[in-house]
Amino acid sequence: MRRAAFALLAAAGAFALAPAAGAADLARGGQIYALHCATCHGPAGQGGIPGAPKFNRGERLMQSDFTLLATVRRGRNVMPAFGGVLRDREILDVIAYVRTLQR
């Protein structure tokens, strides 16, 4: 019961952090992407190293902002965690920017 309550509170808190539609700073997201993400995911999201998802296709980006935020915070497989490097707002800006890379 405690775990369920904690999960519900965590989800509610994350949604409170979610930006209003159109509130993302795409320019800042692009700058952060170029600095922290492009080496592995490619400058245009086309992929760079084996195991790094391609963002110029929509499969990975069909996930919610909340799910992608959690993945970037914690890291996954070969991707390091960025929770201690970037603020949630910055990660959300990167997510919004990456969504513009889809073909």
Model-derived features with residue positions:
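Gly/Gly-Pro-rich "capping" loops immediately C-terminal to redox-active cysteine motifs
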Residues: 26, 30, 45-71
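The canonical Cys-X-X-Cys-His
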Residues: 29-43, 94
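Post-cleavage N-terminal segment of exported redox proteins
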Residues: 1-25, 71, 85, 98-103
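A broad, structure-centric signal for solvent-exposed, well-ordered loop/edge residues
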Residues: 8, 39, 47, 62, ...
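Short acidic/polar micro-motifs centered on Gly/Asp/Asn
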Residues: 15-17, 42-47
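Axial heme c-ligation environment in periplasmic c-type cytochrome domains
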Residues: 49-56, 71-103
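Short amphipathic alpha-helical/adjacent loop interface patches that line ligand
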Residues: 33, 37, 65, 76
